[in-house]
Amino acid sequence: MKKVRLSEKFTPHFLEVWRTVKAAQHLKYVLKGGRGSAKSTHIAMWIILLMMMMPITFLVIRRVYNTVEQSVFEQLKEAIDMLEVGHLWKVSKSPLRLTYIPRGNSIIFRGGDDVQKIKSIKASKFPVAGMWIEELAEFKTEEEVSVIEKSVLRAELPPGCRYIFFYSYNPPKRKQSWVNKVFNSSFLPANTFVDHSTYLQNPFLSKAFIEEAEEVKRRNELKYRHEYLGEALGSGVVPFENLQIEEGIITDAEVARFDNIRQGLDFGYGPDPLAFVRWHYDKRKNRIYAIDELVDHKVSLKRTADFVRKNKYESARIIADSSEPRSIDALKLEHGINRIEGAKKGPDSVEHGERWLDELDAIVIDPLRTPNIAREFENIDYQTDKNGDPIPRLEDKDNHTIDATRYAFERDMKKGGVSLWG
């Protein structure tokens, strides 16, 4: 029996990822990146190996079924050849199926455009425990994918089996795309492993591919960064290059010493959440530190006041959205939050506030303390005009903690020579 050295089949980068996969510490393995990184090639090989290791059925999905045969089906056939195990596999085209002959378990294929067919899959002998969604960004919402996941995650598996989900995609350019918001975050679920790869980590590429990549880099660097490096550039300009987002970057000891407090409140109604934020401002270092947050939908004024009092935040001034004067009055008169006042908005106050934040030396955020602040500051992008060119104003969605932060630092913006009245 011929032995195949995986170190000769995998790139060094993906050999390390394969070791992580084999360690079985995660449910979800998300591989994203630019063109030529070979992420899909490696997932296909891993699926072949896992099918030979475990008595499971593997489900492979594209958003639209009629794209399956010429993409993932061919990719998996190629993986069988690359691993030199073609004699152990049966290829069927009607329906599309790859069967591991010694055991009889199969790789099956479906389209996300017919979820009922996914829900109705029955594989009593070999449970559907593996799944690969290729071109994940083709799905319009995270909820679409969640429905499919729940269709697979059913009963407890027999010994020797485990659930394992692969996802692969090239990041869309828009930062607000759901896949970018979910998987570019500093705050990932413990069951999810995310890897980003580029063609620069693939030693098996042709000289022609590399020359083409370098030519694109020379002609259009933004296109190169998006297509070949897999960067979600959004408008092409990063709103906050001064972000420092890292788990544990703000310690309890530091929070205990923070004494230059700024607090802001953006009222939420309907689909918009309420956002209360608490920051420390280090004027000497020109940095701000996110300390705490309350971000949720349908938060009553009583709950807001209870949160402020419970955490002993009422002694510091709160600057709130002035478009809700009745809510401000109610917090003050009915709920005893006396140090609250409305923000003084002007025609250019939004742009001035965003510019002030951008000119800080650092915006320091610990996603374990303030996950919503981290998510919004990471994912926000500039608005664009009809030609797709960025304009100096942030998108007016998923920006509630950012708005609350602008309110919190209103007085500092005026003192720094930036007028909220323009």
Swiss-Prot record:
It comes from Bacillus phage SPP1. Binds 2 divalent metal cations per subunit. Mn(2+) is preferred over Mg(2+). Optimum concentration of Mg(2+) is 10 mm. As the Mn(2+) dose increases, gp2 converts supercoiled circular plasmid DNA to nicked open circular DNA, subsequently to linear DNA and finally to completely degraded DNA. This is Terminase, large subunit. Mn(2+) 2 binds at residues 266, 400, 403. Keywords: ATP-binding, Endonuclease, Hydrolase, Magnesium, Manganese, Metal-binding, Nuclease, Nucleotide-binding, Viral genome packaging, Viral release from host cell. A motif (Walker A motif) lies at residues 33-40. It comes from the Viruses. The N-terminus contains an ATPase domain and the C-terminus contains an endonuclease domain. Optimum pH is 7.8. Disulfide bonds: none annotated. The lineage of its organism: Viruses, Duplodnaviria, Heunggongvirae, Uroviricota, Caudoviricetes. The gene is 2.
